[in-house]
């Protein structure tokens, strides 16, 4: 492609030269169009490839091929799987599927707690060499002390905590935000406080521990305000 705008991250010149030298162009076709931009591969830090356990929804093969088609060369997979990657043994099942089925780079998250049940910390130390971070995605960690200990261990291991924030006692069977749509059409709503209260708690723990933290989902203006003020 010629005349396109090239968007690039910083790259060591020696690496760039090596890549250029390795490209064979015996029958090169030139596509000339200044309307387009050329980017390096994208990375999606929150995907669900659903293997092991839920291959009827997605697989490493289908998920990675769809990612590559869309320009994503690296993704980070969430741990709400069966079995949950909460131990070296369970994580290895996922790593084997990644090795056999993925056409892109896949970096899994390990679970924060065993079975994502919020009762016992998972084997963070054992999984650390092969995960990008720790998350109980799909469920909020309800115990303040459990989340504090998770942050401290993650900090010692150099791995980020990635949180799905919900206070279970405030869900009350809801499955959609308790806003105008829910009130007009009848779905049972979830109050904004369910999300915001746990984000506020976690941000206080972040201040106490000084560690890296990411919220998976932000769905209310109240949550945005809490984060903005932190």
Task: Report the location of each language-model feature.
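Divalent metal-coordination and catalytic microenvironments
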Residues: 4, 35, 46, 67, ...
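A glycine-rich helix N-cap at a beta->alpha junction
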Residues: 96-112
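Active-site mouth loops of central-metabolism enzymes
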Residues: 45-58, 79-81, 107-119, 185-193
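Histidine-rich, glycine-flanked metal-binding segment
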Residues: 1-41
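Short, acidic/polar
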Residues: 56-64, 115-126, 201-202
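Histidine/acidic residue-rich metal-binding segments in metalloenzymes
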Residues: 121-230
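Short coil/turn connectors at secondary-structure junctions
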Residues: 25-27, 34, 72-73, 101-105, ...
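Metal-associated gating/positioning segment near the N- to mid-region
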Residues: 36-101
